[in-house]
Amino acid sequence: EYSPTVVIHGIGQSKTYLYENDEIAVDEDGKQITGWPIYANTKYIIKNLLWPLVKMLVTQRDDGFVESFRKTLEGTLYVNAFDSNGKNVYDVRVKKYPQSVAKCSDEDKEEIYCNVPIDGFSKVAGEDHLYYFAYNSFGNNSEITDELYNFIGQIKRETGHDKINVVAISLGGTIANSLFDRYPELYPSLDRVVYIVPALDGSNIVGDIYLGRLSTSDEMLYKNLLPNLVG
């Protein structure tokens, strides 16, 4: 018999929603406002960026576009705003799957298998021994780690197993490493740990951003970046 497996997904492989008055918030068109997938109000974006973009392309210089873009981006991504302690500014909640995949609805199963193609594995190990840990990819690492630790405890109680498999994908590798560092007492409970294209050692790109090594010159923007983006 196989040990139960918990899958820790990668970035953006879960849904998050903005809540107001304990209900999912909607915009003026009745569309649910999500943190991920990123909620984009097309009318708002076009209204704020179209004219500044046209002016920039015609004049080949920043004629207010960068500032307009900054404000528009801020207004578009506001749902995912965090304070200095890594806490959500707004009430953003993750869609959770607190039970085994076997007990999930057909809709939830489809979401899980669409995010991570593990249906082949589930046919071998059994959906009743497969769990999907959903978390906010932009959330507080410590809080997510604590949630995962408690989730693993729940899985062991539900299945009656003493050991568990951990499958960490992409950003999930960072979460798994945090788990093992924060809760070393979990080691005896681990059967197998599988990392799939994991983010284990940080990112060179993020390091370059912090060190100011990214070019922001007009030449880079207008002659290199934009033409490549447009194709």
What are these regions (language model features)?
Residues 226-230:
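Long, compositionally biased eukaryotic signaling regions
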Residues 1-167, 171-225:
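N-terminal non-catalytic accessory region
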